[in-house]
Amino acid sequence: IQGVEKIDNRASYKIKCNLRILPRDDEQIKAISVITNFDFGYGILSSPPGSGKTYMASNIITRLKERTLVLVDQDLLLEQFMESILEFTDITREEIGIIKSQTLEYDLDKKVILATMQTLVKKKDILEKLSTNIGFVIQDECQIASCETIREILKELRPKYILGLSGTPYRDDGFDFLIREMLGP
């Protein structure tokens, strides 16, 4: 439309990174392609256990090349996600930041930041600092995450892209629609 200017206030902070391992099957290739070509910038990758969701998320990080915040529910998932990023990409341990309850210092200038949601939601000062330099947010196991916690975090951030990962898109409490409302279809 002539005379109309599109304003995009979403944060974008480009990083350099590459993939080490190619997708293992056509399903991964298709899912990665659909997600990296989405114009609206958000969505949920729902795929069965063992299908390679963390691989696909790592692949997407290398394609979007945006500073990424990965939200997890517990320390074990944080460690597993970090190992996947280290295995599947050329991102080094020194380029990954950690935000969890036992961490005393937070380096927010890393290419990828892994955070437990419970710790991050309590650290308003950190959320404020992240609000301008995170271009991509990944919510791992989005079906079990607290909707209120996700909402608290996402209202502070303005990422260009948001991706939820789920083995099943359904919640036990029936509030599936809230996850889709925050993270997309």
Where are the language model's segments positioned?
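Conserved pre-motif I regulatory segment
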Residues: 6-46
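Conserved helix-turn-beta segment of the N-terminal RecA-like "Helicase ATP-binding" lobe
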Residues: 76-100
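Conserved helix/coil segment N-terminal to the catalytic DExD/H
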Residues: 100-136, 147-152
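Post-DEXD/H (motif II) to motif III coupling segment of the RecA-like Helicase ATP-binding lobe
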Residues: 135-136, 143-185
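Charged, low-complexity intrinsically disordered regions
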Residues: 1-2
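Conserved phosphate-coupling serine/threonine residues in phosphotransfer and NTP-handling enzymes
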Residues: 49-51, 116, 166-168
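Walker A/P-loop
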Residues: 38-64, 69
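Hydrophobic residues on the short alpha-helix immediately C-terminal to a glycine-rich phosphate/catalytic loop
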Residues: 35, 56-64, 81, 153, ...
